[in-house]
């Protein structure tokens, strides 16, 4: 039985890790984990060990909000590096979170660790900080990419497919689409996804609540499961139906308003027309504009940009995020163009990410 040290700091990283572990267990049998991950995985996979740190301790977004975690991250890196020598570890899997995983890989190399290191979900060097490329390539043995264009930037990356195509179990078909078009406005289900972090929710929910008054049909507020006991941050949500399974919410929704993040790509792949709305601290936006050189911030639109396609969905940022703009975008939505690009995205990204990564883990 193999033992892996994993670093999955974000909620999305743990969702991806869960699918990888399912694929590994199905194809190769039992395993053990050490590192940073969601405690729920211990029960689900009947693990004997517990995480050194819970992933919830490291969740943050923005240049300012991450600062308090720096000292904790340094402590965790030191402890994880020591753990790699005191436990029999077959492989180290780092998922996303470059601000943590790159320093961790450096610490491992400096300590003389010979354990194979895999980086899954590579840093977005195509957006900013391309100078990280040689550092990443020299500190990781395998670069498991989920983006078809990563190989334009990394010399030794291997594209293994996009994890969302494995994780989403139901996609809209033509019958679903026709059913949406046959509905009157007061029969439509509208989903609101204001993000998972407290700061995102506080900025978007007042606008989403006011916007929801424009719709007479069913209104769903998608709340991540780990936020279900913290509903006070959303304010008065009595007019919404609360659900937490994002793909299922998107499957039943006729339209969605979504904070920037993984959910925008989920909506595109499921086939739910949506508008992206994002508000951040002014200082975060200022810093981002200095370094990030992209036309769009939504993942689906970024993929379309790299493929030479027009944007898939409208995006509204900062002061442009208001009820008037969002409702107008809903009323003027180009559904035909949206669905055409959805088909392209599925073909572009491919399936099989979890199974392919499980195979890599078994071979190291």
UniProtKB/Swiss-Prot annotation:
This entry's Enzyme Commission designation comes to: 2.4.1.182
- Coiled-coil stretches: none
Q: Does the keyword Lipid biosynthesis apply?
A: yes
One of the entry's Gene Ontology molecular-function terms is:
phospholipid binding
Q: In which pathway does it act?
A: Bacterial outer membrane biogenesis; LPS lipid A biosynthesis
Q: Which UniProt keywords apply?
A: Glycosyltransferase, Lipid A biosynthesis, Lipid biosynthesis, Lipid metabolism, Transferase
Against InterPro entries, the record matches this protein to: Glyco_trans_19 (IPR003835)
Superkingdom of the source species = Bacteria
Q: Which reaction does it catalyse?
A: a lipid X + a UDP-2-N,3-O-bis[(3R)-3-hydroxyacyl]-alpha-D-glucosamine = a lipid A disaccharide + UDP + H(+)
Provide one Gene Ontology biological process annotation: lipid A biosynthetic process
List the Pfam families.
Answer: LpxB
Q: Which HAMAP family match?
A: LpxB
User: Which family, according to the similarity comment?
Assistant: Belongs to the LpxB family.
Provide the protein name: Lipid-A-disaccharide synthase
């Amino acid at each position: 039985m193999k033992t892996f040290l994993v670093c999955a700091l974000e909620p999305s990283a743990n969702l991806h890790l869960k699918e990888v572990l399912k694929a590994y267990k199905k194809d190769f049998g039992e395993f053990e984990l050490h590192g940073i991950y969601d405690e729920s995985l211990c029960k689900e996979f009947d693990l004997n060990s517990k995480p050194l740190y819970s992933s919830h301790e490291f969740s943050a977004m923005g240049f300012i909000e991450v600062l308090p975690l720096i000292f904790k991250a340094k402590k965790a890196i030191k402890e994880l590096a020591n753990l790699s020598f005191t436990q029999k570890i077959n492989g180290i899997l780092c998922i996303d979170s470059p601000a943590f995983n790159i320093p961790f890989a450096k610490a491992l190399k400096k300590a003389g660790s010979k354990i194979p290191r895999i980086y899954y979900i590579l840093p977005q060097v195509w957006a900013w900080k391309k100078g990280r490329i040689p550092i990443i390539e020299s500190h990781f043995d395998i670069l498991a990419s989920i983006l078809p264009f990563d190989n334009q930037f990394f010399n030794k990356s291997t594209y293994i497919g996009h994890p969302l195509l494995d994780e989403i179990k139901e996609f809209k078909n033509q019958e679903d689409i026709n059913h949406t078009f046959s509905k009157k406005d007061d029969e439509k289900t509208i989903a609101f996804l204001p993000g998972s972090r407290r700061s995102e929710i506080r900025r978007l929910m007042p606008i989403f609540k006011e916007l929801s008054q424009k719709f007479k049909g069913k209104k769903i507020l998608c709340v991540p499961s780990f936020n279900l006991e913290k509903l006070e941050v959303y304010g008065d949500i009595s007019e919404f139906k609360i659900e937490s399974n994002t793909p299922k919410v998107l499957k039943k929704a006729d339209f969605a308003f979504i904070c920037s993040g993984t959910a925008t790509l989920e909506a595109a792949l499921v086939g739910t027309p949506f508008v992206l709305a994002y508000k951040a601290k002014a200082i975060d936006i200022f810093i981002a504009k200095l370094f990030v050189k992209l036309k769009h911030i939504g993942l689906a639109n970024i993929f379309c940009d790299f493929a030479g396609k027009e944007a898939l969905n409208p995006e509204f940022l900062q002061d442009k995020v208001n009820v008037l703009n969002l409702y107008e975008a809903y009323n003027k939505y180009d559904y035909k163009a949206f669905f055409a690009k959805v088909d392209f995205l599925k073909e572009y990204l491919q399936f099989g990410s979890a199974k392919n990564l499980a195979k890599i883990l078994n071979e190291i």
